[in-house]
Amino acid sequence: PGYGFAKVPQEVKEHWHSLIEGYLSNRESLRLVVVLVDIRRKPQELDADMIWWVRQSRTPLLVLATKMDKMSRNQAFSALSKIRKTFALKPEECVAFSALDGRGVDEVWEVLNRAVTGAAER
């Protein structure tokens, strides 16, 4: 499950918080952070926190809205728009994705390629 659903004590979650923040702040070779969100769920506070940390680290970001195959094209478009608006994402920072039917795969590969080849410098 995602970090928001992990059944661990609050002190463990706080430890994760400091680990993630430290990693994002100190990992100079980090080229891209991909944050997975379920397109069917309303945007979560923990996702907003993660996106904020990534932005503070000035690392390129991709929010991958997963499970788009679980909704109609119109529903997916509307949900993706809400995610972009809620998190103030540029269009290229948020991609709808389905591992089941492959939608969004080409866009993800483009972003990953730009990140690892240096086209998306900090």
Where are the predicted features?
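Residue-level preference for alpha-helix termini and adjacent loops
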Residues: G2-G4, H15, Y23, S29, ...
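Inter-motif core of Ras-like GTPase G domains
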Residues: P9-R40, I51-L64
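Conserved G1/Walker A P-loop phosphate-binding module
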Residues: P1-E11, N113-R122
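Canonical P-loop GTPase G-domain recognition
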Residues: D69-R122
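Conserved catalytic-core segment of NTP-binding enzymes
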Residues: K42-R58, M71, A76-I83
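Pocket-edge positions in alpha/beta enzyme catalytic cores
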Residues: V8, V12, F97-L100
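Conserved nucleotide-binding/hydrolysis micro-motifs of P-loop NTPases
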Residues: G2-F5, R40-P43, K67-S72, L100-R103
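Short, Lys/Arg-enriched charge-dense amphipathic segments
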Residues: V35, D49-V63, F87-L89, N113-R122
